[in-house]
UniProtKB/Swiss-Prot annotation:
Known catalytic reactions: (S)-4-amino-5-oxopentanoate + tRNA(Glu) + NADP(+) = L-glutamyl-tRNA(Glu) + NADPH + H(+)
CDD domains documented for this protein: NAD_bind_Glutamyl_tRNA_reduct
EC number: 1.2.1.70
Name of the protein: Glutamyl-tRNA reductase
Domain text: Possesses an unusual extended V-shaped dimeric structure with each monomer consisting of three distinct domains arranged along a curved 'spinal' alpha-helix. The N-terminal catalytic domain specifically recognizes the glutamate moiety of the substrate. The second domain is the NADPH-binding domain, and the third C-terminal domain is responsible for dimerization.
Record's miscellaneous remark: During catalysis, the active site Cys acts as a nucleophile attacking the alpha-carbonyl group of tRNA-bound glutamate with the formation of a thioester intermediate between enzyme and glutamate, and the concomitant release of tRNA(Glu). The thioester intermediate is finally reduced by direct hydride transfer from NADPH, to form the product GSA.
Catalytic residue positions: C51 (nucleophile)
Enzyme class: oxidoreductase
Residues the UniProt record annotates as site (Important for activity): H99
Record Pfam families: GlutR_dimer, GlutR_N, Shikimate_DH
PANTHER family: GLUTAMYL-TRNA REDUCTASE (PTHR43013:SF1)
Length: 442
């Protein structure tokens, strides 16, 4: 295959939450349209942007692909490539495939085994397909990533004791407050992470849950699910005074809670402590809030300690999962390599079929009128001959191509042997027929 798979990204290991916030791609439209102009050096792209990572999968020609992607990415965020490069990793070929399979299987997550990343990857793929940004290679790669993730979950226990970011947030709250039954929590946002947080809060014995969401109906639905109260988003600054624990996970582009807002809230609370956990990227809560007395603000990076304690339980299972990823990455690499062989197989079959059809036409001309049944029988016979004659050469070619590094040499030999780069069937293709006819005439 002339084109190569690239994966360019940053994540919670290479970049702080501040950096991830700066380069988050909450709307990937501009970038996808910028990276895939028709007929340019990049033909396919899928963009995954979550609170813990931004990763761009691209199929393109030449070593300049990563720089091109980085330029578009930085420009989409109003930054320069030089601002982005220190935090970025670039994977190519099978390394890109292996990394994506690890991401899909949640082996590269802050919380190994958490289920959210697979849904986020599927959503990213759906959006790319909707914008016609994928073709054969990424379509195959993403679907394979989904099946690898399913296999990892089925064949290993990597997810059995996994904690989600939402679980880690609630565990952190329990460490601060201890007994939760006397406290009231507010969830800002009503997505999957908020729903998970509500589940864990309820299990921890929280006294009451409030849900504030821009779309009131969705907030109301979540609140009812957990016997809580829905709050109008415009009343957020007023109702915050009732909450001891606030967990925020919206998709806002700018902070929705600022220090000046909390100063007023603290006065109404008579300076009773407030505990904020911001698990959104970009962040929902202005970091300056943490400078206020009686306010404790934690962001997604602060949850690592809780997560690390859970890691030891899953190390053995993660090792099994990585073996699966390695195996499947190797299988995908073979398929990718086979794309180089496919045109030769197609050309070989077409050549045989063209010769067969020419011979059929000559034979029918010599025979004169024949009925449809005879014509169909002759056609079926020729198709069978073409398949059987080509079966052994194609099987040999595939086997040698898979087994040996010099697979491209076999392609070259085959193309030259059968004259596959010539548009027309050579005149000597009919030489046997001519010699046979001369003997018949003698």
């Amino acid at each position: 295959m002339d084109q190569e798979i690239y994966l360019i990204g940053l994540n919670h290991r290479t970049a702080s939450v501040e950096v991830r916030e700066r380069f988050a791609l909450t709307d990937c439209t501009v970038l996808e349209q910028g990276v895939v102009p028709t007929g340019d050096d990049i033909s396919e792209v899928v963009i995954l942007s979550t609170c813990n990572r931004v990763e761009i999968m691209a199929v393109g020609n030449g070593p300049g692909v990563p720089a091109r992607v980085l330029d578009c990415w930085a420009a989409a965020r109003g930054q320069k490539r030089s601002d982005l490069e220190p935090f970025v990793y670039v994977h190519k070929g099978i390394d890109a495939v292996r990394h994506l399979f690890s991401v899909a299987s949640s082996l590269d997550s802050m919380v190994v085994g958490e289920p959210q990343i697979l849904g986020q990857l599927k959503d990213a793929y759906r959006k790319a397909v909707g914008r016609n940004a994928t073709r054969v290679v990424l379509n195959r790669l993403l679907h394979k990533a989904f099946s690898v993730a399913k296999r990892v979950r089925t064949e290993t226990g990597v997810a059995s004791s996994a904690v989600s970011i939402s679980y880690a947030a609630v565990e952190l709250a329990k460490r601060i407050f201890g007994e939760m039954s006397q406290y009231k929590a507010m969830l800002i946002g009503a997505g999957e992470m908020a729903e998970l947080a509500a589940t864990h809060l309820l299990n921890s014995g929280i006294r009451e849950i409030m849900v504030a969401n821009r779309t009131f109906e969705r907030g109301l639905q979540l609140a009812r699910q957990f016997k809580g109260e829905a709050v109008l988003f415009q009343d957020l600054s007023v109702r915050l005074a009732e909450a001891d624990i606030i967990i925020s996970s919206t998709g806002a582009h700018e902070p929705i809670i600022r220090a000046r807002d909390i100063k007023d809230v603290l006065k109404r609370r008579k300076n009773r402590p407030m505990f904020f956990i911001d698990i959104a990227v970009p962040r929902d809560i202005d970091p300056d809030v943490n400078n206020l007395d009686n306010v404790y603000l934690y962001d997604i990076d602060d949850l690592k300690e809780v997560v690390e304690e859970n890691m030891a339980q899953r190390r053995d299972e993660a090792a099994k999962a990585r073996s699966i990823v390695e195996e499947e990455a190797g299988n995908f690499a073979k398929w990718l390599k086979s794309l180089d062989l496919q045109p030769t197989i197609v050309d070989l079959l077409r050549r045989s079929e063209r010769i067969a059809q020419d011979e059929l036409a000559r034979t029918l001309k010599r025979l004169g009128p024949v009925d449809d049944a005879t014509r169909e029988a002759l056609q079926a016979m020729l198709c069978a001959i073409v398949k059987k004659v080509n079966h052994e050469p194609i099987t040999f070619l595939k086997r040698r191509f898979d087994e040996e590094e010099a697979g491209t040499r076999y392609i070259d030999i085959t193309r030259r042997m059968f004259n596959l780069d010539c548009d027309d069937v050579p005149d000597d293709a009919h030489s046997d027929r001519k010699h046979t006819q001369q003997r018949d005439d003698a």
